[in-house]
Design a protein with these regions (language model features):
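Glycine-rich phosphate/diphosphate-binding loop of Rossmann-like nucleotide-binding domains
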Residues: 1
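A short acidic, amphipathic alpha-helical/loop segment
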Residues: 29-30, 48-52, 235-236
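Generic beta-sheet signal
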Residues: 20, 40, 58-60, 103, ...
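Short acidic loop-to-helix transition motifs that present clustered carboxylates
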Residues: 21-26, 44, 230-232
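ALDH superfamily catalytic-core signature
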Residues: 4-13, 34-36, 42-188, 210
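Short acidic-hydrophobic, aromatic-tinged amphipathic segments that line or gate anion-handling sites
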Residues: 18-23, 103, 203-209
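Conserved C-terminal structural/oligomerization subdomain of aldehyde/semialdehyde dehydrogenase
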Residues: 4, 11-14, 33, 79, ...
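A structured beta-alpha segment of the ubiquitous adenosine-cofactor-binding alpha/beta core
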Residues: 17-36
Length: 281
């Protein structure tokens, strides 16, 4: 809707636009019939469009905060940045961090994050302290929570938030369903939960060797690299696949509107052409 309003503000007639709320099946039918389209979602909903040149695919993000050796050793100074990366916008954006990759102190870091995130609880929607968004579809919340539990059941991972707060992850408040923030510490970057994202504040904490960075991260939309190690920064600048790289204590959701990390909408909707004009007479 913001894109539509921007077009209208630029002078395009309102009659040129339509808002068509629909199911997933309805959305797919719209994409099949349109000349150009954009789709946002997880791998399940976007994979089928990857080879269709008409459709611009966005998602999943797998965004991450990475602490270099110096920052991992002094992690207490960076908890605010990590928490903001995970929890802003109720953790529902593709630029929210779903992973915190560190080079040491994974156990201590995961607990510090969990203790902070455990303070985020459901509140009334007009409460200025409200940070969690409810789920309109209870089944979706149940599915996401079940996916986390399924990954934990495989072993090699611990739900750290479960050790610092009472009760379950899925709760009902004032008739609405919520998923409470969850931090999982994985023993290996190969664990099923090490590179997952969900529509609530969720993050896995993974410890790796400094020399494995950045290649071991895998695809990442946004990465906040916190370190004063210039050699590590250079490796990320030259070898990272991240679309947005924040160097320093900059939360992953903080973006510069003059630096679109996924291109410009104009490039998808229009063909670029240079035209010069002069009257013949």
């Amino acid at each position: 809707l913001r894109i539509v309003q921007a077009f209208i503000a630029a002078g395009v007639p309102k009659q040129a636009f339509a808002s068509l709320p629909s199911s997933h099946a309805g959305a797919e039918e719209i994409l099949r019939r349109c000349g150009r389209g954009m789709v946002f979602g997880d791998t399940g909903s976007t994979a089928k469009w990857l080879t269709d040149s008409r459709i611009e695919v966005h998602g999943p993000g797998y965004s991450k905060v990475v602490l270099g050796p110096d920052a991992s050793a002094n992690f207490e100074k960076h908890i605010d940045t990590i928490v903001a990366s995970i929890a802003e916008n109720s953790g529902r954006s593709c630029v929210n961090a779903s992973g915190v990759w560190v080079t040491s102190h994974a156990k201590e870091i995961s607990r510090a994050i969990a203790e902070r995130l455990a303070q985020i609880v459901p509140r009334l929607e007009d409460d200025p302290l409200a940070q969690l968004a409810p789920f309109a579809n209870t089944r979706a919340a149940e599915y996401f929570s079940g996916a986390v539990d399924g990954g934990l059941a495989e072993g090699g991972a611990e739900d750290v938030t479960a050790t610092v707060r009472p009760g379950k992850r899925l709760v009902v408040f004032e008739g609405s369903t919520y998923l409470l923030p969850t931090v999982v510490r994985c023993d290996s970057p190969a664990h099923a939960l090490a590179n997952r994202e969900f529509l609530f504040p969720f993050a896995s904490v993974v410890e790796v060797k400094p020399e494995e960075l950045p290649e071991i991260l895998g695809p990442s939309l946004a990465v906040a690299l916190i370190t004063d190690d210039e050699e590590l920064k250079t490796r990320f600048l030259t070898r990272s696949s991240a679309h947005r790289l924040n160097l320093g204590a900059i939360p992953t959701p903080h973006i510069g509107w003059d630096q679109p990390h996924e291109g410009n909408l104009f490039e998808h909707l229009y063909s670029r052409r240079a035209i010069q004009f002069q009257k013949a007479s």
